[in-house]
Amino acid sequence: MFTLKKSLLLLFFLGTISLSLCEQERGADEEENGGEVTEEEVKRNILSGIANGINRVLSWFG
């Protein structure tokens, strides 16, 4: 049970970091494009952040 709680806490922490990195990247894109960010860019950033978080977790357990 402790291992499960620890794993869930780790996933939550990594998810929070990934989302904050996506927000920073989106902010940088807005500055480059004069404030315009397409919906496609937002989705790509979120999905890449999630994928990076999953890869990190899997590398720790694998």
UniProtKB/Swiss-Prot annotation:
Removed propeptide positions: 23-42
The keyword Signal is annotated on this UniProt entry: yes
Disulfide bonds: none
Tissue expression profile of the protein: Expressed by the skin glands.
Entry similarity comment: Belongs to the frog skin active peptide (FSAP) family. Brevinin subfamily.
Function recorded in the entry: Antimicrobial peptide. Active against a variety of Gram-negative and Gram-positive bacterial strains. Not active against fungi. Shows weak hemolytic activity against human erythrocytes.
Protein name (record): Amolopin-p-MT1
Organism: Amolops mantzorum
Organism placement in taxonomy: Eukaryota, Metazoa, Chordata, Craniata, Vertebrata
